[in-house]
Amino acid sequence: MQLERIDVQNRKYANALIEKHFFSLEIVCRDEVIDMTLQDGFLCTQNGAYIGVITWQDRGDMLDVTALCTDVTGQGVGTRLLTKAKEAAVLQNKKGVTLITTNDNIRALYFYQTRGFWIKGIDVGAVGRARKIKPVIPLFGEHDIPLRDEIELVWRT
C-alpha cells in the first residue's frame, strides 16, 4: 500500500474515486457547493490500482476533510489516509481536523470516533437544504435511514 499526494498527473484517479462514491464531483456540505476537483489530499494505491482518496480544504485554523473514500474495508486504507490529514493539520499549524458525515453513516461515526474524533455538533435538516441545491441526494441512506442531518466531528492537534 502506497500513499501519494494528489497532483496534476493523478488528479483524474482522485476524481474517479470521488465520483464513484459521491456520484458527482460537486458535493454540498455546510450549505456550500464544493468543487472536489480543486481539493488537496492523498491517494492510496495497492498493486498499481487506486483504492482510496482523502481530500481536504483549509478552513481557517482547521483542516476540513471533504472526502474520504475507499474501495476496500478492513485493510487500514481509511486509517492511513486519515492519518495523512492529521499530519497535514499539524504541519500547517492547524488546531485540528473537522469533517462532516450524515446521520445514516453509522460505519463512519464508528470509524472516526475510534480514531480520536468526537461529535462537535449536529445540523438538523442540513441534508434537506442540500437536496434543494443538489436534488440527486437520496431521501434514504444506509440501512434505509432517512437522510436528514449533517454531523460534524472534530479531532484536535
PLM regions with names:
Residues 1-3:
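Extreme N-terminal starter segment of soluble prokaryotic enzymes
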Residues 5-73, 79-83, 156:
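Acetyl-CoA-dependent GNAT
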Residues 8, 144-157:
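Glyoxalase I/VOC metalloenzyme domain signal
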Residues 25, 32-36, 47, 55, ...:
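Conserved acyl-donor/pantetheine-binding loop and adjacent beta-alpha core of acyl/acetyltransferases
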Residues 89-101:
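Conserved GNAT acetyl-CoA-binding A-motif
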Residues 99-108, 124-131:
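Conserved beta-strand-loop-alpha-helix junction that forms the acyl-donor binding cleft
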Residues 113-121:
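Conserved acetyl-CoA-binding loop of GNAT-fold acetyltransferases
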